[in-house]
Amino acid sequence: MLILTRRVGETLMVGDDVTVTVLGVKGNQVRIGVNAPKEVAVHREEIYQRIQKEKGDEPSH
C-alpha cells in the first residue's frame, strides 16, 4: 500500500485520468473529491461490496 500525506487543496493522480483532491478535514473525517472519466466507476468501499453482493445474488441466465 502506498501511503501519502496531502494537505487540504492538494491533489494526487491515479494514472493519467483520475485525480483525488483533499477538500477538507474536520475531526476524524476527510472530504475528498474524485475526478474520473465516466467509464471509471467510483464508489465508497461499502457500496462497492453491496453492488458485488447483489451481482452474486442475481440468478444466472
From Swiss-Prot:
Keywords: Activator, Cytoplasm, Repressor, RNA-binding, Translation regulation. It is found in: Cytoplasm. One of its GO terms (molecular function) is mRNA 5'-UTR binding. InterPro entries: CsrA (IPR003751), CsrA_sf (IPR036107). GO terms for cellular component: cytosol. The keyword Zinc does not apply. It comes from the Bacteria. A key translational regulator that binds mRNA to regulate translation initiation and/or mRNA stability. Mediates global changes in gene expression, shifting from rapid growth to stress survival by linking envelope stress, the stringent response and the catabolite repression systems. Usually binds in the 5'-UTR; binding at or near the Shine-Dalgarno sequence prevents ribosome-binding, repressing translation, binding elsewhere in the 5'-UTR can activate translation and/or stabilize the mRNA. Its function is antagonized by small RNA(s). Belongs to the CsrA/RsmA family. Homodimer; the beta-strands of each monomer intercalate to form a hydrophobic core, while the alpha-helices form wings that extend away from the core. This is Translational regulator CsrA. It comes from Ectopseudomonas mendocina (strain ymp) (Pseudomonas mendocina).
